[in-house]
């Protein structure tokens, strides 16, 4: 099933992320959420808003350069992954992602299509973000 949520601005993105964070309580962890969309579509903004809704108060930055950031929220550990710069399956393996899944509440994965050969866990949900008129 595909559902569309028109998001007019960052506030609407934050509201959707907050709603999604609230729904996590009814689901079995760990959950893997793939965030897809072009550069500037709002993937990191959505991840930041979701982390805020889960109680993260510290800085939330795009993990583009470090590839992976972990946050201990009131709901549990959230792993935010950005695979944009990944070039090979070996780089993905070197991240040791399997070590991060146990005990996690949620994985937020930006650019999952760069996960090379199915080394990423299958998503429980996918969110496709698009800029209207782009």
Residue ranges and their predicted role:
Residues 56-71:
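Short beta-strand-centered segment that lines the nucleotide-binding/catalytic pocket of NTP-utilizing
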Residues 1-20:
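N-terminal pre-Walker A segment at the start of P-loop NTPase domains
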Residues 39:
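The conserved Walker
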Residues 23-30:
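Phosphate-binding P-loop
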Residues 43:
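Conserved lysine of the Walker
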Residues 33-35:
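Hydrophobic anchor at the beta1->P-loop junction of P-loop NTPases
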